[in-house]
Amino acid sequence: MLDKLTHLKQLEAESIHIIREVAAEFDNPVMLYSIGKDSAVMLHLARKAFFPGKLPFPVLHVDTRWKFQEMYRFREKMVSEMGLELITHINPDGVAQDMNPFTYGSAKHTDVMKTEGLKQALDKYGFDAAFGGARRDEEKSRAKERVYSFRDSKHRWDPKNQRPELWNVYNGKVKKGESIRVFPLSNWTELDIWQYIYLEQIPIVPLYFAAEREVVELNGTLVMIDDERILNYLTPEQKASIHKKMVRFRTLGCYPLTGAVESTAATLPDIIQEMLLTKTSERQGRVIDHDAAGSMEEKKRQGYF
């Protein structure tokens, strides 16, 4: 079966070409590392692109302080094993406000801790190109985004002010203060990602595999009880409804804003089989994508990845 998956090798070659092109063309690139499955694949491709040498750029994690604990443990493990140059940035303004998704809501929390945090980090270190693991099949606004996504000096995305991309030729020319967000996985699908992870045996966060976990239903979303902080924001009725269920995650982010899905897929072949049958987008589990109509495009216009 796997030896016939030639399209994966074509996608791999395209992504490696893009990564090498950016490393050669830009003065100070960085790779965003969100610790999820797409980041894992992108990082694997980057290591392949420059093997046996080390990555010629650092990896950046914009931390919100509300990621799953397993994600933090996995991040430290990967950094140690791969010898990565990791930069972690937390928005100090958000820390001062004790920003959290319960008191301030998902939109405000995401804007302050993710969007503003990312812009702060890019400005602080002067990065002129930033790799991201977004794919066109994820969401409508991402479907119309270029591989080289031009951002102005305020990090804003204007869908009408983008460069044509003919064949595999990309225009990375920017003025001082402007930058490019680069998406090497643009043409991959969620199924491609899982098949490639299986083919290459890429390590991923265990949360992607089904297991019995403590969850509570909040506004129709199964939220995992990842640490004690969440208990401070639950009503007595919600606390009483906490129960264990076989679930896994198709996408990972801040745990109060990431919905689990009921599943028994505990191995990579199980997940691939599940992906072949599913009819819903993985981002349906992201609360931030449902803030308002067109919310993702508006976030991207303001500087979100």
Curated annotation (Swiss-Prot):
SUPFAM superfamilies: Adenine nucleotide alpha hydrolases-like. It catalyses: sulfate + ATP + H(+) = adenosine 5'-phosphosulfate + diphosphate. GO terms for biological process: hydrogen sulfide biosynthetic process; sulfate assimilation. Pathway: Sulfur metabolism; hydrogen sulfide biosynthesis; sulfite from sulfate: step 1/3. GO terms for molecular function: ATP binding; sulfate adenylyltransferase (ATP) activity. Keywords: ATP-binding, Nucleotide-binding, Nucleotidyltransferase, Transferase. The keyword Transferase applies. Its EC number is 2.7.7.4. InterPro entries: PAPS_reduct_dom, Rossmann-like_a/b/a_fold, SO4_adenylTrfase_ssu, Sulfate_adenylyltrnsfr_sub2. The keyword Calcium does not apply. It is an enzyme of class 2 (transferase). Belongs to the PAPS reductase family. CysD subfamily. Heterodimer composed of CysD, the smaller subunit, and CysN. With CysN forms the ATP sulfurylase (ATPS) that catalyzes the adenylation of sulfate producing adenosine 5'-phosphosulfate (APS) and diphosphate, the first enzymatic step in sulfur assimilation pathway. APS synthesis involves the formation of a high-energy phosphoric-sulfuric acid anhydride bond driven by GTP hydrolysis by CysN coupled to ATP hydrolysis by CysD. PANTHER family: SULFATE ADENYLYLTRANSFERASE SUBUNIT 2 (PTHR43196:SF1). This is Sulfate adenylyltransferase subunit 2.
